[in-house]
């Protein structure tokens, strides 16, 4: 688990020697911690092994990211399902639901106030996703977000994830689903920060 590394990281050293930090899933803990403690933008992106058989979209999205996002419309050509429309401005943060849920209540939990949050997961049962999202709601982590992007929850229909949220809270922010976020072959690269 990447969470075990957090107490031993020298964030001042990382800040003085900026590098591209990229990955997804369990690395969500590191990506968000590095951004929040250094201000360096990290990348929720494919892992090196994902490039063994990459799609053109995945390569294009990753290259756009490492070149500073010259193409500003990150979701161009990506299917997006809109559940609650609107305009959101904020800092993009997020990643793997279970990993980030485990950080809530620790010094490493992400500050979601004013953020556009994205969440994804894989191989979790619906009741587990329900429990984790309920934890976010009860911890107040969704109270002041500006927007929410639901990624791929492989094995669970995105409408079910939306239903979990909408039954427990008033959704007064833009909420969309993007199937290219998470444990999928056509993976979009998103900036954390």
Stretches with model-predicted labels:
Residues 2, 30-31, 101, 126, ...:
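Short, well-ordered alpha-helical microsegments
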Residues 39-101, 105:
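Conserved anion/nucleotide-ligand pocket segment
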Residues 9-34, 41-48, 171-176:
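Short, acidic/small-residue loops that bind anionic groups at enzyme active sites
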Residues 1-11:
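Active-site-proximal cofactor/substrate-binding loop regions of enzyme domains
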Residues 152-193:
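ATP/nucleoside-binding phosphotransfer catalytic cores, i.e., glycine-rich phosphate-binding loops
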Residues 28-38, 184-192:
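Glycine-rich, charge-decorated loop segments at or immediately adjacent to ligand/cofactor-binding or catalytic sites
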Residues 108-160:
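Internal helical hairpin/lid segments
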